[in-house]
Amino acid sequence: MKKVIFALLILGTVQVQADVAVSNIWSALPGKGSELVQNVMEARAIHEKMGAEVTLFVDHENNIHYVTGFSDWGAWGKFLDSAPNNKEWQEFWQRASEGGAAELSNTFMLEAPVSAKSQPVHMVFSWDVQQGKTPEFLALCQQSKVIHERLGASVGMNVDELANVHYEMSFESWAAYGEFSQKLAADSEWQKFFTAANAQPTAELVKVWRLSRM
């Protein structure tokens, strides 16, 4: 299980009151896909009763992204503190652990200074940002957001515990994403921005997630 180290993030000039989330990415063991789906559905029902906002996605590799959202880190802490004393959760967790349906492949603790609209299709571009360059990179993201939303995307920005940025775009359907991609490729404003941003890059694209809401 991947260990997570939480660090407070300073977002510079683009900092606003941010929602927070923890995203756990689960990979089903062979032949256990249906059991994993059943488990996350049951976990969601319990966690929502405990006060979390839960969203589920399946990615292009058939991993499940189990996202718990909170108004702030204080609310997250209260949720975490309540888990050991929640009988329903403890009984479920023991049963699910013994069943061994999946492995936790990654965990991200995120702040969202800007949130994308909740829609059936989400694209997430994960950027490894150079140390100390997160505010500068977020400023670039704000500029690209204007272009992408003009072309039909809803854009969000998520900053993880290592100050890396996950740039999110959501759409009504995969067809809508395809139409967006065609328009983007032909957009002169985007081409000019993209060329300028890559002249002195401050981040490296390390992962692209194609997510469908469950």
Task: Identify the residue ranges that each predicted region occupies.
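Sec-dependent N-terminal signal peptides
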Residues: 3-16
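Generic cytosolic/nucleocytoplasmic N-terminal low-complexity/intrinsically disordered segments
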Residues: 1-2, 206
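Short S/T/G/P-rich N-terminal loop/turn motif that feeds into the first structured element of a domain
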Residues: 17-191, 195-214
